[in-house]
Amino acid sequence: MRIAIIDLGTNSLRFDVYDVYDDEEFSLIHREKFMIRLGDDVFTTGQISDKVMDRAMETFDLIKIYIKEMKIKETFAYATSAMRTADNAKKFIKKVRKKIDVD
C-alpha cells in the first residue's frame, strides 16, 4: 500500500511517500520540501495570514496532483507549534480537508 505523510512545520511542509508492505517493511519513494512559512505571522498576530494560507493552498493543490498520480491510498498529516498556536487553525484545517482527504 502507498501512503503519504505531510509534516506541516513552522517554516516548511515536508511531503513523503512510502510503499508499505505486508511484513511491515516500508520504503521511501518520494520526498519533497515546500517552504510555505506557516509561522510567519502566527507568533506576532496569532493568525495564519491570508497570504500564507493562499501559499499553503497552492502547495496542497500540487500535493493533490501527486496523490492522484502516485496512486496514494492514505494520507496522514501532523503539524507543529504554528498550527497549535494559530487562532484560525480550524479554518486552515477545513481548507486543507477540502483540498485533500487527510487524517
Segments from the language model and where they lie:
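Primarily the dimerization/phosphotransfer
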Residues: 11
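Nucleotide/phosphate-binding catalytic cleft detector across ATP-hydrolyzing
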Residues: 1-8, 16-103
